[in-house]
Curated annotation (Swiss-Prot):
The keyword Oxidoreductase applies. Pathway: Isoprenoid biosynthesis; isopentenyl diphosphate biosynthesis via DXP pathway; isopentenyl diphosphate from 1-deoxy-D-xylulose 5-phosphate: step 5/6. Its EC number is 1.17.7.3. Its cofactor is [4Fe-4S] cluster. Keywords: 4Fe-4S, Iron, Iron-sulfur, Isoprene biosynthesis, Metal-binding, Oxidoreductase. Pfam families: GcpE. The keyword 4Fe-4S applies. It comes from Brucella anthropi (strain ATCC 49188 / DSM 6882 / CCUG 24695 / JCM 21032 / LMG 3331 / NBRC 15819 / NCTC 12168 / Alc 37) (Ochrobactrum anthropi). It catalyses: (2E)-4-hydroxy-3-methylbut-2-enyl diphosphate + oxidized [flavodoxin] + H2O + 2 H(+) = 2-C-methyl-D-erythritol 2,4-cyclic diphosphate + reduced [flavodoxin]. It comes from the Bacteria. This is 4-hydroxy-3-methylbut-2-en-1-yl diphosphate synthase (flavodoxin). It is an enzyme of class 1 (oxidoreductase). Binds 1 [4Fe-4S] cluster.
Length: 423
């Protein structure tokens, strides 16, 4: 599976040059586009539930999916999950999330070690005191044996306390001590880099190592990843841990990662959202895609532009139509992506009145300007910048939906036929 299958825009700033890492065929870093990944919240030992959620995340556009491997039952389930997913046509790479006993689980379950595409190691809890380096080395040696990459994932909530204490003591002895926050940031960065250096000394290539350093505050995340980017060329996994629920989590993650991505920092992202009760786990994938697409780094799905509404648009018709078109696009994208290559570049405008409606509609591939309050009950439609018709009557929404479907068929279906004919 290749992440190159989705369109990639040129980056407005030079991308930080990192070493590319292949994760089950998906390239993270190097010149590859920023990869979207996610994580399940099922009990991995529950094969049916985990397969269903991984499949849903993959269909939504997650290019890598992480699963918890926390005990023998979970490790034993991994090859079954991998096999079931492949039978269903989901070749998405699976990452094993290990804490505390990862070295033991990988040794005791070789089929699990083989089935996973990457191992996540947390330096803060891989082992303690004299066992730490040995157990870290055990996992790295497993990665070498099975030719797997690792993510060395530092998290401020489980930071190596010995390292933090050492840096705090040194700072206390210094003439111009840093703040506790600055020492914490330095400890996070050092934990990642020391662990990466140790992995390389053991024999793991730099093209097998991805680093992450997750914190829960936006300014800390920006500072920590900026430091990491300056001190190494390892591929970087961005994520704001414990971002929270709903709007708060989306805004915090987007603010932090948007700034880093704009500076060319970051090779793969996960937006960690706390699901609302009964919420859809795939929401985090959608938000990740929308962040990258809004910033112009990648294209995943056609853009539907719609005005926010004002006193001129007291009717909800344009809002309902915009939502219907967006939902229809999302529902059909898994099929359209295969059937109509390039369709993710489509732009659609659904506008609510005469002020900006015609202009915005002309700039879209296909757009409609619905009548505002007091305007003539008609809706001009523009295709490729030219007015092609005016819709009237109670079926304006249905008529425009059909025009969008016909446009996709005629434009992107024709492109595919021409390409097939040339071959």
């Amino acid at each position: 599976m290749s992440s190159e299958a989705v369109s990639y825009f040129s980056h407005p700033f030079p991308r930080r040059q990192s070493v590319g890492v292949s994760v089950g065929g998906v390239i993270v870093g190097g010149s590859a586009p920023v990869v979207v990944q996610s994580m399940t919240n099922t009990d991995t030992a529950d094969v049916d539930s985990t397969v269903a959620q991984v499949a849903a995340l993959h269909r939504a556009g997650s290019e890598i999916v992480r699963i918890t491997v926390d005990r023998d039952e979970s490790a034993a389930a991994v090859p079954k999950i991998r096999e079931r997913l492949e039978r269903l046509g989901h070749d998405v790479p699976l990452v094993g999330d290990f804490h505390y006993i990862g070295h033991k689980l990988l040794a005791d379950h070789p089929a699990c070690a083989e089935a996973l595409a990457k191992y996540r190691i947390n330096p803060g809890n891989v082992g303690f005191k004299d066992k730490k380096d040995k157990q870290f080395a055990d996992i790295v040696e497993m990665a070498i044996r099975y030719d797997k990459p690792v993510r060395i994932g530092v998290n401020w909530g489980s930071l190596d306390q010995e390292l933090l204490t050492t840096l705090m003591d040194r700072n206390q002895d210094a003439g111009a001590p840093l703040s506790a926050q600055e020492v914490m940031r330095e400890a996070i960065v050092q934990s990642a880099l020391i662990s990466a250096n140790l992995a390389e000394e053991i024999g793991l290539g730099r093209d097998k190592i991805i680093l992450s350093a997750k914190v829960s505050q936006v300014q800390d995340l920006i500072a920590v990843y900026t430091m990491l980017a300056q001190r190494s060329n390892h591929a970087l996994h961005l994520g704001l841990t414990e971002a929270g629920m709903g709007t708060k989590g989306i805004v915090a993650s987007s603010a932090a990662m948007g700034i880093l991505l704009q500076q060319g920092i970051g090779d793969t992202i996960r937006i960690s959202l706390t699901p609302e009760p009964g919420g859809d786990r795939t929401r985090e994938v959608q938000v990740s895609q929308e962040l990258l697409q809004t910033m112009g780094f990648r294209q995943f799905i056609p853009i539907v532009a719609a005005c926010p509404g004002c006193g001129r648009t007291t009717s909800t018709v344009f809002q309902e139509l915009a939502q219907t078109i967006q939902d229809d696009i999302r529902r059909n994208m898994p099929v359209w992506r295969e059937k109509y290559p390039g369709v993710e570049a489509l732009s659609v405008a659904v506008m609510g009145c005469i002020v900006n409606g015609p202009g915005e509609s002309k700039h879209a591939d296909i757009g409609i300007s619905l009548p505002g309050t007091g305007e003539t009950p008609s809706a001009p439609v523009f295709v490729d910048g030219k007015k092609v018709t005016t819709l009237r009557g109670p079926a304006i929404a249905e008529d425009f939906q059909k025009m969008v479907a016909d446009y996709i068929e005629n434009r992107f279906g024709l492109d595919q036929k021409i390409a097939a004919g040339q071959n």
